[in-house]
């Protein structure tokens, strides 16, 4: 995975690295705050490959360290925030939009395959 992460420098721009049973395996680098959003139909899994970030919810903040993961249940408003660059692996249905129910400058409608 480290080799694949070395192929891009952009933040909040998921890259597709594989597909399994209608789900995509994506790599993404976080840095700074993401947009508040919710995913109506999908739970989200955020395993940390390198670094650390915080998952913010309206009522709490959860630290996620390297080698750990967090699952965000569907319909839960959240946003990841990373003070420093963090490398995250995503496993999601192919139809999942990175900004969920929100359109923003960070929305990636057609992720690049690397």
Residue map of PLM features:
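Histidine-centered active-site/metal-ligand motif
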Residues: 37-39, 78
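Ligand-binding loop in jelly-roll beta-barrel domains
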Residues: 74-103
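Short, charged/polar surface micro-motifs in flexible loops or helix N-caps
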Residues: 22-24, 31-33, 51-54, 61, ...
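A cytosolic small-molecule/anion-sensing beta-strand core signal
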Residues: 21, 49-50, 65-66, 84
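Short, conserved beta-strand element in jelly-roll/cupin
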Residues: 29-31, 39-57
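A short, N-terminal "cap"/entry segment at the start of jelly-roll beta-barrel domains
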Residues: 1-26, 103-114
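Short acidic-glycine-tyrosine-enriched beta hairpin
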Residues: 58-76
